[in-house]
Regions:
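Exposed, low-structure sequence patches enriched in small/polar residues
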Residues: 224, 258-308, 314-316, 380-689
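Membrane-interfacial, low-structure loops and terminal tails that flank and connect transmembrane helices
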Residues: 325, 352-383, 625-628
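A generic structural signal for short coil/turn motifs at secondary-structure boundaries
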Residues: 22-24, 162, 194-198, 521-523, ...
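Membrane-proximal, glycine/serine-rich, low-complexity loop/turn segments characteristic
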Residues: 31-275, 279-348, 353-356, 360-363, ...
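A generic short-segment signal for beta-strand/edge and adjacent turn/coil regions
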Residues: 119-126, 139-143, 152-155, 176-180, ...
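Bacterial Sec-dependent N-terminal signal peptides
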Residues: 1-35
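A generic structural signal for short, non-catalytic loop/turn and secondary-structure boundary residues
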Residues: 16, 23, 148-150, 394-396, ...
Length: 689
């Protein structure tokens, strides 16, 4: 333990040294101005009069980062919180989740499943093979788009262990804006776990690139990502007694020396994802005051423009002096007073005699009696001019025309170079890329979905208390599976659905959202999805008590891979009924006491799941034979009850966070869940001066 910590400290020192070196060299590079000299040679001009950066060292660069998520169907923006590097940061690399709510195989990036049923992702698409690796994938609805006043770079590396069982989690993110409307960025994610047991290594790579344009009339979001996921499969250790009762064995085994069921077996997933949403708004303009951040950014831009103009004037004077053969005095030019002067076209008033007759009193002029009154009027005019300078023209959208394109392309390959004798119960084909005891099962799937929507937006007038949308979607799906002759069987499915949304998100007291979608043609004809939520925020004891209700009714088609799958040892073609899933959930939240209570009831009819069975031929569990997997469907409904309490306590620098979850499943052989799940985190939090 001590040696591991010592190695990690050495690695941290190396990283810190590199960081300090980079920080120390940056000012040196900034002070070295490489430019074209008079001899047209590219060389440093350190010995010359080097001009300062146009930004100026005495001006503060605006800092600020806004992030938001979008609705996957309509692209509606929802403000989000920027990730911090303090609270719970040490848990971010863990496959088990921030609060240990996931079951996994223990290794970084290994397959996992959420123990809390109501927190599992409902719609993960058709490709079920990528679902257990959601630690590296990010749904569109959870991705953070960025808008930043200055470029932002964030690089993190979390590492532990050694060359045998070490784990590395690397992330690099860069975000920048081209103007206030266009934002873009990219991100690298790499997870590598060597594994504590034999044949347990994982390697996941993801590259993400995004862009957004937020204009008054036109708005767009683009998200592109590609993933490569690789996991070594060992089938578990051959005998649990290696861990439970190590004294039964004559030899002592290290973790990576314990025999496993499988060797040289790999599971690989590759995928490419493209999401594009854009809309055109029709509305009207109105004047509103800028935010403090916008005012700060505008002042910075004005100061930069003024300084750039001064630099341009100095450069012109320098060139003029060079052409005239004169010496240019930098100090004298900087001290030269600037006079506005009289305009060239100004008229000179003559000494004409005043009219003798009395002028008629104008009704359009304002009488100013005394200097104080004049000063007051001038101050008011100056204040009005300043107020006008910090006003902006806001475009209020009334109607939106929305289009969303979502494309996903997957490939999954299971490779085995050797398989234990009689390990599998069935063998459906021997032709293909590998023969003998080797396996090469490959399947491909791509899906393209287009959605068109027409929206009347909330809040464009005092009478528009809610937003209303109508949409139509077309979904095209393609699948490829091997056949018994070594070829490929191809399947195509299409679906057309229509629906609508009614929502209210503005205001403080009441919010609600209801969405309904009906399948009208194709494979998903007859499906129905109704989702809704409502929250009421009541002032209570000097704070806000939030009462939240949510629920849904889904009648959906089971995933293609529950209905059809072809592999060398697993094969099924099922005619499954539609899954009917109903949920009602209530949440009570009180920020003053840091308390939240959730209670949910689920009922699922025709639940689809995978069932595995095998034989154990001796007592030591080492000889497993007849392994088979089948997709099944539960005919009778499965009922689940979930009650969850969040309670945080803070007393001075002492913080204590607790989550207690109770779950009950009516059919544990179909949906097994732990009856009790407890999470507790006790820590000290204080400022460091």
């Amino acid at each position: 333990m001590y040696s591991t910590i010592q190695k990690m400290m050495k690695k941290s020192k190396v990283i810190l040294t590199i960081t300090l070196f980079c920080a120390a060299t940056s000012p040196v590079v900034a002070q070295t101005d490489f430019s074209n000299n008079e001899d047209s040679m590219f060389a440093p001009v350190n010995n010359r009069n080097v001009r300062t950066d146009s930004l100026g060292s005495d001006k503060e660069i605006p800092k600020g980062l806004k992030v938001w998520t979008i609705d996957e169907r309509f692209g509606d923006r929802q403000e989000a919180q920027v990730d911090t590097l303090q609270h719970m940061y040490m848990n971010t690399p863990f496959t088990s989740g921030l609060k240990g709510e996931y079951n996994s195989l223990g290794n970084l990036g290994s397959p996992r499943i959420n123990r809390i049923f109501i927190d599992r992702r409902l719609d993960q698409g058709q490709f079920i093979f990528a679902q257990p690796f959601d630690c590296i994938s990010t749904p569109v609805s959870e991705f953070h788009f960025t808008n930043t006043y200055s470029p932002i770079t964030n690089v993190t590396l979390n590492s532990c262990g050694n060359r045998t069982n070490g784990e590395d989690d690397f992330k690099a993110m860069f975000a920048v804006n081209a103007g206030k409307r266009l934002g873009m960025g990219f991100r690298f994610d790499y997870k590598y776990g060597r594994g504590y047991y034999d044949s347990q290594s994982t390697s996941h790579f993801k590259y993400t690139m995004w862009g957004s344009y937020i204009g008054d009339r036109y708005q767009a979001h683009l998200l592109f990502s590609t993933l490569h996921q690789k996991a070594t499969e060992n089938g578990g250790i051959t005998n649990d007694d290696y861990i439970k009762h190590p004294e039964l064995f004559e030899d002592t085994y290290a973790e990576n020396e314990i025999p496993t069921v499988l060797q040289q077996n790999w599971n690989r997933n590759n995928s490419v994802h493209v999401f594009f949403n854009h809309r055109y708004n029709v509305g009207f303009n109105r004047k509103v005051r800028m935010t403090d951040e916008e005012i700060k950014a505008k002042k910075f831009a004005m100061a930069s423009k003024k300084e750039n103009a001064a630099e341009d004037a100095k450069e012109e004077a320098r060139k003029k002096a060079r052409q005239e053969g004169k010496k240019f005095d930098e100090d004298a030019f900087g001290k030269t007073p600037k006079f506005a002067g009289r305009p060239d076209d100004a008229k000179i008033a003559g000494d004409e005699p005043a009219a003798d007759k009395k002028e008629a009193k104008s009704t359009e002029r304002i009488a100013v009696n005394g200097k104080s009154a004049a000063d007051s009027i001038m101050a008011q005019e100056k204040k009005a001019a300043q107020d006008t300078a910090w006003m902006k023209n806001e475009y209020v959208p009334v109607t939106s025309f929305i289009h969303t394109l979502k494309f996903d392309n997957y490939s999954r390959t299971y490779i085995a170079y050797q398989t234990p004798a009689d390990y599998y119960l069935n063998e459906y084909y021997t032709a293909g890329k590998y023969e003998g005891d080797s396996i090469y099962d490959n399947t491909k799937h791509w899906e393209m979905k287009n959605t068109l929507a027409l929206a009347t937006l909330e809040g464009f007038s005092k009478w528009a208390k809610a937003g209303l949308k109508a949409f139509v979607s077309y979904d095209l799906r393609h699948f490829e599976l091997p056949d018994t002759e070594g070829g490929v069987m191809k399947y195509n499915e299409h679906s057309v659905s229509v629906g609508g949304q009614l929502s209210k998100r503005q205001g403080k007291l009441l919010h609600y959202n209801a969405v309904a979608e009906i399948g009208v043609a194709g494979e998903d004809a007859g499906t129905l999805a109704v989702d809704g939520d409502v929250d009421v925020n009541i002032p209570f004891l000097g704070d806000t008590l939030s009462v939240i209700g949510s629920g849904f009714f889904h009648r959906i088609t089971p995933s293609f891979y529950f209905r059809n799958y072809h592999g060398r040892h697993f094969w099924w073609e099922n005619d499954l009924d539609k899954i009917i899933h109903t949920r009602i959930m209530g949440t009570l939240k009180f920020a003053k006491t840091k308390t939240m209570l959730r209670v949910a009831v689920d009922e699922i009819k025709n639940y689809a799941y995978l069932s595995q069975s095998y034989n154990v031929t001796d007592n030591n569990q080492s000889a497993r034979t007849g392994v088979t997997v089948q997709a099944k469907q539960s005919g009778s409904p499965v009922n689940l009850l979930t009650a969850q309490l969040f309670q945080d306590v803070r007393w001075g620098i002492l913080n204590w966070e607790n989550v207690i979850t109770y779950q009950h499943s009516s059919k544990t052989d179909v949906i097994p869940v732990p009856a009790l799940n407890v999470y507790s985190n006790l820590y000290l939090k204080f400022p460091v001066v």
